[in-house]
Curated annotation (Swiss-Prot):
Molecular-function annotations in GO: dTTP diphosphatase activity; UTP diphosphatase activity
Name assigned to this protein: dTTP/UTP pyrophosphatase
SUPFAM superfamilies to which the protein is assigned, alphabetical: ITPase-like
PANTHER family tied to this protein: BIFUNCTIONAL DTTP/UTP PYROPHOSPHATASE/METHYLTRANSFERASE PROTEIN-RELATED, BIFUNCTIONAL DTTP_UTP PYROPHOSPHATASE_METHYLTRANSFERASE PROTEIN-RELATED
Key words of the record: Cytoplasm, Hydrolase, Nucleotide metabolism
């Protein structure tokens, strides 16, 4: 059966290729602003991932396995999205430096042939070291933080700020592979 990744993220595409050799990418145009955060970050990321997957399911005219995910960075139970601009990136990174924060991913797998849907979420604790303002500004100049939740990419230059990680590394990148592997086995 065809496998579809409902994501434009090159990071998710690269990660999924470690589990599945052949899959299609169909970018979901689900409006994430329709999902209202009501206090549970687990529920929030699962609801967005479900919205993305259902958006693709409703367009298909053949059976498929659909995979979608959403990842957010949180500190003090506040969601840190992608920065609006360089100043916002600076403020986000500054708020993370020297502190622990949590990265949550919601993952949804749909088997349209069986009309089955599995939703899971995972959190990973990340601790940043102390970072000088100059280091933050140099990092922002690379452009890397501008399209990432929490304004950093652990798999890129932003990884140098990480002092400690507790949990799934791939969750922080955007697709928790171990969790997804078991979800795919369960839904077959």
């Amino acid at each position: 059966m065809k496998v579809i990744l409902a994501s434009a993220s090159e990071r998710r595409q690269e990660l999924l290729s470690r589990l599945i050799k052949t899959f299609d990418v169909i970018v979901s145009n689900f409006d994430e602003s329709k999902v209202i955060f009501e206090g549970s970050i687990d529920r929030y990321v699962k609801d967005i991932a479900l919205g993305k997957a259902m958006n693709i399911k409703n367009k298909l005219d053949e059976d498929a396995i659909i995979i979608s995910a959403d990842t957010v960075v949180t500190i003090d139970n506040m969601i840190l999205g992608k920065p609006r601009d360089e100043e916002d990136a600076f403020n986000i990174i500054k708020s993370l430096q020297g502190r622990k924060h949590l990265v949550y991913s919601g993952v949804v797998v749909i088997n349209t042939a069986k009309n089955l849907t599995i939703q899971e979420s995972l959190s990973t604790e990340v601790t940043f070291s102390e970072i000088s303002d100059d280091e933050i500004l140099e990092y922002i100049k690379t452009g890397e933080p501008l399209d990432k939740a929490g304004a950093y990419g652990i798999q890129g230059i932003g990884g140098i700020f990480v002092e400690e990680i507790r949990g799934c590394y791939y969750n922080v990148v955007g697709l928790p592979l171990n969790k997804l592997k078991f979800m795919l086995k369960e839904i077959q």
